[in-house]
Amino acid sequence: MNDLHQRILLTADDGSRGPLLRIADDRLPPGGSYGRHPHRAVDVVAVVLSGSLRHGWGDGAVVGAGDVAVLRAGTGLDHDETAGDDGVRVLQCYLRSADPAAPPSHEVHRGPRGWVELGRSDARLWVARVLPGQSVTAPAGLLVLRGADRVVVEQQSGGPVPEAGAALVWQLDTARPAWAE
């Protein structure tokens, strides 16, 4: 993982954000890699902001800018992710697995706008790409916004996205989960 430049935007492993554990803003240079690593009992939702990322498990999918990949680790897997020729900037969002006994799976949603199907009832993800001068109204929830020169994470009650860029909103069942008590 020595190619990785990572900034942790949010950690909530105490259950205060329901199933959401962490959001990381990751950057890899062209051909850079996370290195082979394991996951178990976690769902990783990767939102590619720029560049591309090849997933080294399953079908070896390439996830491009604007795509959302959902990795359900379930019973566990080892994998690697490698940046394409243009490098990659990706928001990696980690959620406690909705079904830790399920076999691992991986799917890619190509360029979604609006709600992304995550296959779980305790977390919903809304995605938009806001162009300069465009007005987009986001739903209430935890807003993650990548503007021209910053990434912000803030709880908001819904309304206009404040600046151009990639916007995500997490709606989470924040009732304190049994594992956090």
Could you describe each region identified by the protein language model?
Residues M1-E181:
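Jelly-roll (double-stranded beta-helix
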